[in-house]
Amino acid sequence: MWGGILLLGVSGIYNIILANSKPVDLILQVHVDPPPPCSVTGSSVDFQTVNINDINGSNYRKDAGYTLSCPDRKADDLRMQLRGNTTTINGEKVVDVGGPGFGIRIENADNNSLFSIGENNWTPFNITSQPKLNAVPVKQSGAQLSGADFSGSLTMVVDYQ
């Protein structure tokens, strides 16, 4: 019995509020910051001449040696993405250099772990501790490589977190 009376009372209050409602204009403003104004320099790795038989995923490891500068950024917490043509070597996504069974593995220099490449892979970082990257030639297990010149490239994208 009490439940029915309470429900009826709430219903009556709702109708009173609804009868006295007044439309109000709501103004929403959104400010979207542009991407941070960053520049990247010194981002070229030249392996020079390597011996095909010595390519094992750790020989010929080189520092990617880039410098990232974002002087007019609005925040210190950024994120990085590497984009480019990739291939899969021994189950890992690496930079495609145009040779079958051959690629360049991008690594976190701190622990030589694979650095994720691709449009869905963002790595958060603070401008004071930027990711250090290595590049190392890799070949598919059992691949027979021929001598040739190879090259590959990546695009570094930096944005706010």
PLM regions: where:
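Mature extracellular/passenger domains of Gram-negative fimbrial/pilin and adhesin proteins
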Residues: W2, Y14-Q161
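Sec-dependent signal peptide recognition
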Residues: M1-G9
